[in-house]
């Protein structure tokens, strides 16, 4: 538990230090330079009192948050994070544009998205950690309808990352396998967009791990430690007006960049807006996004008319139920409507339109008049912006360029003119996400190939007699550094278990082998039968690609990575696993060790708690284990209690 608390402390404390040294618009109004935009005196009075409204309990009237606004409706590949920033962190919020730019420069050092076609999953039984290639899995951050998100750490750079695990096909395909192809299309689309979109307010993709033999795709993303944007607490808002305004500005910048690149998100909502350590909001989840590089036409309109996303954030043109009137044309204005609903949620802690039934909700979105609560008071500028964002007619709805120029959006900025100039998306080059890039975003796996892979993966290896001169395949759970002096020699889990099970088949053969390896033990009781020893290692840590091993075991959130200690004693090589650092690993000494090459694996188990109290020539033996009496290991609290030995041929 101590390591967990220390780890969380190291993650939180630097954030506070950064925020303390940044500019706060709430207290630095006197430093705001004059701007070309008109001032609204009424808003300065609102701003002075806006930060304290969170302490009050404002009634939401007769409105309730309907289940339709939750995560379960329609949204695919949703980030569902468990960590939420506490209210004590909200007061440290500030104008974070400069800090976001510094972090953005660090993310740009990643370069192009790395594509890996080979995946190696490992589970370390000694430390309880799981590894996907060189990423250490720490814990689960959350899961949605079609995927899950893990917190990982790069074992090389020690950087925290988010690993999104997405199945290539639906687990429960429905009529005509339509869902399977739909899921593939969502995964392809999200990967293709994340590969090309590079913006400070869009979640950055670092690596795509896509093994053709795997049924899942692993997306390595930047870690958003703040989780989802908080917006409601028992139908009451949790953000001040200035905080909601800053979050809103970040979303506007990210959404403007996406529209400039010809990408319509189609699922803008607070659950898909994530916070990083500097409280910068970034847009995530592009599973239902639409790519329209060539402009919008009739085919685009038909595709955009499909109701994907979250119903509570649907635009009126998506909810059209009147057959007597023509439906308005569908365009990127649906994202502007969802942006307005999101701003309403951030300000008032609830959705503008709610109903118990989906059809009733659609009718309200199309026909019901927008009702803006009087508390908290967002001023005339805020009301004007909400009305223009939530305009029923998409032709009359405000555009994102107009949103950026709106006085309510610019209020509180140090230099609005410079902000508009630096955030212009036309200063960056356009990216094109072609149909071929979407189609080739992931590798396809045939059903026959998957079945054959599972068949060979679960088949136990045939028993064979080990030759002392032959090398043994390495166990996936044993990770050791490469050595230039010796070849990589190891022992697989199933082979180790089979080797011990074969010792109980033939008693005479067992006695002969015991005489060669453990003559002292034979002198005590040569007729004593040892029970059949099965370590339970003859199964894989990850049974198959459809079920992760993390569902069956808990996480150990220690900071250290399992290390390997190796010593050479005569003709034996000893490997020991420990969760300590390399400098703390006790050395193994075995002077005068005389081992005979039997070609049989030997497992030595020592009870080091009582090791010092025992005579030097006494070696405790656990029934079912074959131990080596001549192996002297260093005692003490730092000495590992487990080691694996096997014969090998040293290389000169």
Curated annotation (Swiss-Prot):
Residues of the Protein kinase domain: 135-409
Q: Which positions form S-S bridges?
A: none
Q: Keyword Transport on this protein? A: no
Q: Which domain of life is it from?
A: Eukaryota
Catalysed reactions listed for this entry: L-seryl-[protein] + ATP = O-phospho-L-seryl-[protein] + ADP + H(+); L-threonyl-[protein] + ATP = O-phospho-L-threonyl-[protein] + ADP + H(+)
Q: Which residues form the active site?
A: 267
Q: Which stretches does the entry tag as region Disordered?
A: 467-491, 506-529
Alphabetical list of Pfam families matching this protein: Pkinase
- Name positions with the PTM Phosphoserine: 59
GO cellular component: a single term:
cell cortex of cell tip
Q: What class of enzyme is it?
A: transferase
- Where are stretches of biased composition, namely Basic and acidic residues? 508-518
Keywords associated with the record? ATP-binding, Cytoplasm, Kinase, Nucleotide-binding, Phosphoprotein, Serine/threonine-protein kinase, Transferase
Q: Which residues carry this modification: Phosphotyrosine?
A: 58, 63
Q: Where in the cell is it found?
A: Cytoplasm
Q: Which GO terms describe its molecular function?
A: ATP binding; calcium/calmodulin-dependent protein kinase activity; calmodulin binding; protein serine kinase activity; protein serine/threonine kinase activity
What biological-process GO terms show up in the record?
CAMKK-AMPK signaling cascade; cell growth mode switching, monopolar to bipolar; cellular response to glucose starvation; induction of conjugation with cellular fusion; negative regulation of TORC1 signaling; positive regulation of cell cycle switching, mitotic to meiotic cell cycle; positive regulation of G2/M transition of mitotic cell cycle; regulation of actin cytoskeleton organization
Entry's EC annotation: 2.7.11.1
Q: What is its main location?
A: cytoplasm
Which residues bind ATP per the record?
141-149, 164
Q: What does this protein do?
A: Involved in actin localization and thus in polarized cell growth.
Name the family the entry cites.
Belongs to the protein kinase superfamily. Ser/Thr protein kinase family.
Official protein name in the record: Serine/threonine-protein kinase ssp1
Species for this entry: Schizosaccharomyces pombe (strain 972 / ATCC 24843)
